From Swiss-Prot:
Coiled coil spans: none
Enzyme Commission (EC) number: 4.2.3.81
Gene Ontology biological-process annotations: diterpenoid biosynthetic process; terpene biosynthetic process
UniProt-listed PANTHER family: (-)-ALPHA-TERPINEOL SYNTHASE-LIKE, OS04G0344100 PROTEIN-RELATED
Organism: Lavandula angustifolia (Lavender)
EC supergroup of this enzyme: lyase
Name the UniProt record assigns to this protein: Exo-alpha-bergamotene synthase
Top-level taxonomy: Eukaryota, Viridiplantae, Streptophyta, Embryophyta, Tracheophyta
Pfam families (alphabetical): Terpene_synth, Terpene_synth_C
C-alpha cells in the first residue's frame, strides 16, 4: 500500500465558534435611512460638478471610497459626456490627461495612447519637468497600467514614472503621499481589490485638507453596513461547512473557509450579490479539498477512479471509490444539483450539464498533473501552462461566477463561455502564475508537480531569479490582454468586472507569498479589516 503523503497544513484560526460570534450594530432602518439621505447629498454634488477635472476627481474618489456602485448611472452619464465632448486634453496638464485616460479606459472607452504625446520631447522621451510633481508621476504611473500589448508610449510611461518614483519615495516629506507612492509601486490601483482599497483610502482621504465630510460619512457608514452583510454570509457558510462534516472527514486537506470567503468577496464584492458569494465560497472550499486529494493524499490508481467518477457524474458508481473520495464527490455533486435546481426553478434553464463539464475538465487537469508528478516528468513551460491555467480552477470559478450573478442567463453567452474565450483564459492565467510565484517553493518541498518556475528553469537552465522574472513578464502580458478585453465589444460585457476581479484577488493573495494555503499576517489583516473591524463613527 502506497504511503499517504501529508501537506502538514497549518490549522485555520477562523473556527466556527469565532465566526458565529461576529456581530455588527450597523443594521436596521435607522442606518438605511441615514445612508439614503447621504446618497441624495452626493448626487447633488455630482450634479453641481461642472468642471471636467472636478468631475473626474469626484468619480475617482467615489470609486476608491468603495461607494461608486450607488451612483453607476450618474458616473456612466458623466463619463459619456466627457468622452463625447469637444474638450481637448489639456496639453500641459498631465494629471488631468492621465486621470481622464485611466477612468475612461476602465469604463470601456478606447482612448488612444497618443494623448500622452504632447508631454514628450522630439526624441520621444517624457519632458524633464514631469518629474517635478510626485502626484503627477503617480497619476501617470497609474494610467500606464491600463495598457494593451503594443502600446509603446504607455510602456515608456510606466518605466519612466516607476524609475523616478522609486528614486523619490524615500525623500518624500509628506507621510500620506509617501505611503501612497509605496502602495502604488507595490501594486497599481487598477489591479487592487476594491474593498481593501476602500478600507485604506477612506482613512487617507479623510486626512486631506479638501476632503468632503459627506463622502467620508457615507463611505464609513456604507462600509460598516456592508460588513454586517458579509458577516451574515460568512456565518451561513460556516454553518454549512460544519454540517457537511468535511473538516473532520478530510483532516489531511487545507481547511480555509474564511480565506475562501475573502476570495469570493474580492471576486464578487457588490453587496447585492450575497447569494453568489455564498455559492462561490462553498465551491472554493470544495475545490481546495479536491486539489489536496489530487496533489497530496490520493494514490494514483484512486485518482484515476476519482477522475472517471467526474466524467460519469453518476452516484451509482460511488462504491468504486474509497470513502474519503465518496464524501468529497457527493458534496460536489449535491452542491451542483442544488444550484442547478435553483436556476431551473427560477429561470427554466438546465445548467447541470455545464457544471458537469466544468468539474470533469478540472479533474482531468488535476489527474494529468498527478501523473506527471508520480512519473517524475517535468513538462516544458508551454506544456505545463496549457494544463495549469485550467487546473488552477479559474474556468470553473468564472463559470460559477457567471451563473450565479446573471439573470436571465443567456444560452448564447453560456455556450461562448464554455469555449474559454480570452475573458476566461487570461484571468485564469494570472491566477495560475501568481499562485506559482507565491507557492512553488513550498509545494516542491512538500512534493508536488513542478510549477512554471521549475519548468522554465529545467527548460532553459536559468536560475530561479531569472525564472521568476520570466513568470512576472507572463503575468504582465496576461494583464494587458485582460485590459484589451474591457475595451472590446462582446456578448458578455457585464461579466468583465468579475473576471478582472479574479485577477485582482489572485494578485492580492499571493503578493507576499502563499496567502491562502499558509495564511500570513496580510491575509489575516485583510480578513479582520473587511469582516471584523468597523470604522468608528461618532
Amino acid at each position: 500500500m502506497e504511503a499517504r503523503r501529508s501537506g502538514n497544513f497549518e490549522s485555520s484560526i477562523w473556527d466556527d465558534d469565532y465566526i458565529q460570534s461576529l456581530t455588527s450594530s450597523y443594521t436596521g432602518k435607522m442606518y438605511v435611512d441615514k445612508s439614503e439621505k447621504l446618497k441624495i447629498e452626493v448626487k447633488m454634488m455630482m450634479d453641481e460638478a461642472t468642471d471636467e477635472l472636478e468631475q473626474l476627481e469626484l468619480i475617482n474618489d467615489l470609486q476608491r471610497l468603495g461607494i461608486s456602485y450607488h451612483f453607476k448611472d450618474g458616473i456612466a452619464k458623466m463619463l459619456n459626456n466627457i468622452y463625447k465632448s469637444d474638450s481637448k486634453y489639456m496639453e500641459k496638464d498631465l494629471h488631468l490627461t492621465a486621470l481622464k485616460f485611466r477612468l475612461l479606459r476602465q469604463h470601456g472607452y478606447r482612448v488612444p495612447q497618443d494623448v500622452f504625446s504632447s508631454f514628450m520631447d522630439d526624441e520621444g522621451n517624457f519632458e524633464a519637468w514631469v518629474v517635478e510633481d510626485v502626484s503627477v508621476l503617480v497619476s501617470l504611473y497609474e494610467a500606464s497600467h491600463i495598457s494593451v500589448e503594443g502600446e509603446s508610449i504607455l510602456d515608456m510611461a510606466k518605466d519612466f514614472s516607476s524609475h523616478h518614483l522609486t528614486e523619490m519615495v524615500e525623500q518624500i516629506g509628506e507621510a500620506c503621499l509617501a505611503e501612497q507612492v509605496k502602495r502604488t509601486l507595490e501594486l497599481p490601483l487598477h489591479w487592487r481589490v476594491g474593498r481593501l482599497e476602500a478600507r485604506w483610502f477612506v482613512q487617507a482621504y479623510e486626512t486631506r485638507p479638501n476632503s468632503n465630510p459627506t463622502l467620508v460619512e457615507l463611505a464609513k457608514l456604507d462600509f460598516n453596513m456592508v460588513q454586517a452583510k458579509y458577516q451574515d454570509e460568512l456565518k451561513r457558510c460556516s454553518r454549512w461547512y460544519e454540517e457537511t462534516g468535511l473538516p473532520e472527514k478530510m483532516s489531511f486537506a487545507r481547511h480555509r473557509l474564511a480565506e475562501c470567503f475573502l476570495w469570493s468577496l474580492g471576486f464578487i464584492p457588490d453587496p447585492h450579490h450575497g447569494y453568489s458569494r455564498e455559492i462561490m465560497t462553498k465551491i472554493a472550499v470544495l475545490i481546495t479539498i479536491t486539489d489536496d486529494i489530487y496533489d497530496i493524499y490520493g494514490a494514483l490508481e484512486e485518482l484515476q477512479e476519482f477522475t472517471e467518477a467526474f466524467e460519469r457524474w453518476d452516484i451509482n458508481s460511488l462504491d468504486l471509490l474509497p470513502e474519503y473520495m465518496q464524501i468529497c464527490f457527493l458534496a460536489i455533486f449535491n452542491s451542483a444539483n442544488e444550484l442547478g435546481y435553483q436556476i431551473l426553478r427560477d429561470q427554466g434553464l438546465n445548467i447541470i450539464p455545464n457544471l458537469k463539464r466544468s468539474w470533469a475538465e478540472l479533474s482531468r487537469a488535476y489527474y494529468l498533473e498527478a501523473r506527471w508528478f508520480h512519473n517524475g516528468f517535468v513538462p516544458t513551460t508551454d506544456q505545463y501552462l496549457n494544463t495549469a491555467w485550467i487546473s488552477i480552477s479559474g474556468p470553473l470559478l468564472l463559470s460559477y461566477g457567471y451563473l450565479t450573478t446573471t439573470n436571465p442567463i443567456n444560452n448564447k453567452e453560456l455556450k461562448s463561455l464554455e469555449k474559454h474565450p480570452s475573458i476566461i483564459r487570461w484571468p485564469s492565467m494570472v491566477l495560475r502564475l501568481a499562485d506559482d510565484l507565491g507557492t512553488s517553493s513550498e509545494e516542491i518541498k512538500r512534493g508536488d508537480v513542478s510549477k512554471s518556475i521549475q519548468c522554465y528553469m529545467n527548460e532553459t537552465g536559468c536560475c530561479e531569479g531569472d525564472a521568476r522574472h520570466h513568470v512576472k513578464s507572463l503575468i504582465e502580458v496576461a494583464l494587458k490582454r485582460m485590459n484589451d478585453e474591457i475595451l472590446m465589444e462582446k456578448p458578455f460585457k457585464s461579466f468583465d468586472t468579475n473576471a478582472m476581479n479574479l485577477a485582482r484577488i489572485s494578485l492580492c493573495f499571493y503578493q507576499y507569498g502563499d496567502g491562502f494555503g499558509k495564511p500570513h499576517s496580510d491575509t489575516i489583516k485583510n480578513l479582520v479589516s473587511l469582516i471584523v473591524l468597523p470604522f468608528h463613527m461618532p
